[in-house]
């Protein structure tokens, strides 16, 4: 029994405990070593990260990047619609293929189920290689496992990732299009973009089978004529708390966690902070999920002043909820920005409602965004550590979906996410404990039922 791995939640708790005892929290130089050890991937030094919070501007920048690309364009998305924006992206990809570039599109078969075959032929007939991830009729046993990533990589040097799918509702500014959604993307360069290309390559080879009948299956090895990408190698077991870097292990304090009877190591000596750092987190079923949970737990444990989270689908496991409320109880300014009645999935909103009483009692401030449909997925800790990507705080993102996120350790990016969060609060409504207690009995009943089935949503 002693050789068995502990439950995922316990491993995440270890990461939380290790971060709790860093003197500087997420700003502590040892925090960088901590999250890198949790994930096992490289920590990148890179040019400034650009935050894109307006859909129209984000897609203008991305299509411009496609138009100036010289060798390769890789697009991976959960939803690719055959609407106005989707057609514009299609045309940009066709133009790139006409210039002789290698252009590859990977879309989820369920997310893009409403897209007509003629749209895909409008890509494949002009030299774009397309694959659909896990068609239900081809892979019925894997129906729940979806490719929820959203990323664009150009020449393995410039990349974009975040929460935006390809559809008119994502790509229109809320100032110009009443039905637009509020979402967030980031632009990264250098070695981060190269790793995101490796993420795409891994997803491409997992999407078995061609996009359309009659097309041949083409593996990534057959497509890739440039030097092969070095895919990420993760450690075989969760490394904490016994594998912290030697540089920060010289003076360690130990205390006994009486509740769990486990040793939590405390880092006393730290080094000089480095420059901006970015960590790519790309969990998928069978790999990277516990690392993703560990990094989130470390962010919650490392918060010292404020912890601001934006998520459209909030249905976390009990352990994650307890770590969130623990931060509020120790005096951290914890705020949650969640969707209002304009949500696209009302049942998940009611599942989130089932946790409101616990959150409010712990001192977490809860807001509902009312200006548009909320779809952004961001977390910013102490104005320094920012987590941006496709992952929601729900069971699907934790256990079923392939996701793509970037953890940015940088004050400038943190300040930008902070500013965006505060701007979003100006068009949001705060939920008070008194108002919450006054909700109707049918509302309470629906919240309880949805909360009970949150693992299936």
Placement of each model-derived feature along the sequence:
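Catalytic-core elements of nucleic-acid end-processing and repair enzymes
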Residues: 377
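Active-site donor-binding acidic/aromatic loop of nucleotide-activated sugar
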Residues: 366-370
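N-terminal localization/anchoring segments of enzymes in phospholipid and broader phosphate metabolism
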Residues: 1-298, 302, 326, 340-343, ...
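Short glycine/threonine-rich loop-to-helix capping motif typified by GTGT followed
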Residues: 322, 348-350
């Amino acid at each position: 029994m002693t050789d068995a791995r502990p439950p995922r939640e316990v491993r995440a708790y270890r990461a939380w405990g290790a971060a709790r005892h860093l003197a500087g929290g997420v700003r502590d130089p040892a925090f960088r070593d901590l999250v890198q050890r949790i994930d096992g991937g490289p920590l990148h030094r890179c040019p400034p990260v650009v935050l894109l919070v307006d859909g129209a501007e984000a897609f203008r920048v991305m299509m411009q990047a496609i138009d100036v690309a010289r060798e390769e364009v890789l697009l991976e998305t959960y939803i690719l619609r055959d609407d106005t924006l989707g057609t514009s992206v299609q045309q940009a990809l066709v133009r790139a293929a006409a210039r002789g570039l290698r252009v590859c599109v990977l879309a989820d078969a369920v997310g893009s189920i409403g897209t007509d075959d003629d749209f895909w032929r409008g890509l494949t007939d002009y030299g774009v290689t397309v694959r659909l991830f896990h068609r239900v009729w081809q892979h019925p046993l894997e129906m729940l496992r979806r490719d929820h990533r959203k990323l664009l990589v150009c020449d393995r040097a410039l990349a974009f990732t975040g929460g935006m799918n390809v559809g008119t509702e994502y790509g229109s500014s809320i100032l110009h299009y009443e039905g637009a959604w509020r979402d967030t993307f980031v632009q990264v360069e250098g070695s981060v973009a190269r790793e995101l290309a490796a993420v795409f390559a891994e997803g491409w080879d997992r999407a078995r089978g061609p996009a359309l009948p009659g097309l041949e299956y083409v593996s990534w090895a057959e497509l890739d004529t440039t030097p092969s990408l070095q895919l990420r190698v993760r450690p075989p077991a969760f490394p904490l708390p016994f594998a912290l870097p030697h540089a920060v292990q010289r003076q360690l304090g130990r205390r006994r966690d009486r509740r769990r009877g486990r040793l939590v190591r405390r880092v006393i000596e730290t080094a000089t902070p480095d420059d901006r750092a970015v960590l790519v987190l790309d969990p998928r079923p069978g790999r990277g999920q516990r690392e993703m949970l560990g990094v989130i737990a470390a962010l919650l444990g490392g918060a010292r002043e404020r912890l601001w989270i934006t998520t459209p689908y909030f249905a976390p496991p009990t352990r994650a909820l307890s770590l969130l409320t623990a931060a509020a109880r120790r005096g951290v300014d914890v705020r949650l920005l969640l969707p209002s009645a304009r949500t696209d999935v009302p049942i998940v909103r009611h599942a989130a409602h089932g946790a409101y009483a616990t959150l409010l009692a712990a001192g977490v401030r809860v807001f509902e965004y009312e200006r548009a449909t909320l779809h952004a997925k961001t977390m910013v800790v102490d104005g320094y550590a920012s987590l941006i990507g496709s992952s929601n705080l729900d069971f699907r993102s934790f256990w079923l979906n392939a996701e793509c996120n970037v953890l940015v350790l940088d004050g400038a990016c943190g300040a930008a996410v902070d500013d965006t969060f505060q701007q979003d609060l100006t068009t949001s409504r705060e939920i008070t404990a008194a108002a919450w207690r006054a909700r109707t009995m049918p509302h309470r009943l629906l919240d309880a039922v949805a909360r009970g089935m949150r693992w299936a949503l």
